[in-house]
Amino acid sequence: MDMLFDPGWAAHLLLLAAEEAAAAEAESGGLFDFGGTLVLQIVNFLLLMTILSAVFYGPISRVIEERSEYIRSNAGSAQRRFDEAKALADQYEQELRTTRLEAQQVIAAAEAEAQKIRAQQLAEAQREAQERIAQAQADLDKQKQAALASLSGEVEAISRTLSEKLLSDSARRF
């Protein structure tokens, strides 16, 4: 059995066949000798092909086929995993877009609410300022009226005093 796997054996067999062919050609003197040597060479060749087929080509073909099947299986599995990963990536991107859109909507709503509150506070501040201005104006008007009333009374008193003085000076002169 070890003899079948010995690479030197096959080379030795070929060398023997070549020697026999050379000897046969030398004896016959022609290019082709259709005698027993040619038949023996054909038998040797067919025997060698059968042995190589049984020992090397069959197992090698089987290993190559198994490897091809393994590669096809892994390629299919890899394609499925790639498709799953792509689907997950697409789903992630869709969720990310949705989340960003929701975040933009929340930000827009918060900005609108802040603008509304700002407008309300500004309106309230303006109303309070108008009330204070109106109150201050009313207080100034009251103080003005009080000052005018006080001055009016004083002017009347001064006018009377001045009139009396002028009348008394006029009366003394006449």
Swiss-Prot record:
<dbReference type="GO" id="GO:0046933">
    <property type="term" value="F:proton-transporting ATP synthase activity, rotational mechanism"/>
</dbReference>
<keyword id="KW-0406">Ion transport</keyword>
<comment type="function">
    <text>Component of the F(0) channel, it forms part of the peripheral stalk, linking F(1) to F(0). The b'-subunit is a diverged and duplicated form of b found in plants and photosynthetic bacteria.</text>
</comment>
<keyword id="KW-0813">Transport</keyword>
<feature type="transmembrane region" description="Helical">
    <location>
        <begin position="38"/>
        <end position="58"/>
    </location>
</feature>
<keyword id="KW-1003">Cell membrane</keyword>
<keyword id="KW-1133">Transmembrane helix</keyword>
<comment type="subunit">
    <text>F-type ATPases have 2 components, F(1) - the catalytic core - and F(0) - the membrane proton channel. F(1) has five subunits: alpha(3), beta(3), gamma(1), delta(1), epsilon(1). F(0) has four main subunits: a(1), b(1), b'(1) and c(10-14). The alpha and beta chains form an alternating ring which encloses part of the gamma chain. F(1) is attached to F(0) by a central stalk formed by the gamma and epsilon chains, while a peripheral stalk is formed by the delta, b and b' chains.</text>
</comment>
<keyword id="KW-0066">ATP synthesis</keyword>
<comment type="similarity">
    <text>Belongs to the ATPase B chain family.</text>
</comment>
<dbReference type="GO" id="GO:0045259">
    <property type="term" value="C:proton-transporting ATP synthase complex"/>
</dbReference>
<dbReference type="InterPro" id="IPR005864">
    <property type="entry name" value="ATP_synth_F0_bsu_bac"/>
</dbReference>
<dbReference type="InterPro" id="IPR002146">
    <property type="entry name" value="ATP_synth_b/b'su_bac/chlpt"/>
</dbReference>
<dbReference type="InterPro" id="IPR034679">
    <property type="entry name" value="ATP_synth_b"/>
</dbReference>
<keyword id="KW-0812">Transmembrane</keyword>
<keyword id="KW-0997">Cell inner membrane</keyword>
<dbReference type="InterPro" id="IPR050059">
    <property type="entry name" value="ATP_synthase_B_chain"/>
</dbReference>
<keyword id="KW-0138">CF(0)</keyword>
<keyword id="KW-0472">Membrane</keyword>
<keyword id="KW-0375">Hydrogen ion transport</keyword>
<comment type="function">
    <text>F(1)F(0) ATP synthase produces ATP from ADP in the presence of a proton or sodium gradient. F-type ATPases consist of two structural domains, F(1) containing the extramembraneous catalytic core and F(0) containing the membrane proton channel, linked together by a central stalk and a peripheral stalk. During catalysis, ATP synthesis in the catalytic domain of F(1) is coupled via a rotary mechanism of the central stalk subunits to proton translocation.</text>
</comment>
<dbReference type="InterPro" id="IPR028987">
    <property type="entry name" value="ATP_synth_B-like_membr_sf"/>
</dbReference>
<protein>
    <recommendedName>
        <fullName>ATP synthase subunit b'</fullName>
    </recommendedName>
</protein>
<dbReference type="Pfam" id="PF00430">
    <property type="entry name" value="ATP-synt_B"/>
</dbReference>
<dbReference type="GO" id="GO:0005886">
    <property type="term" value="C:plasma membrane"/>
</dbReference>
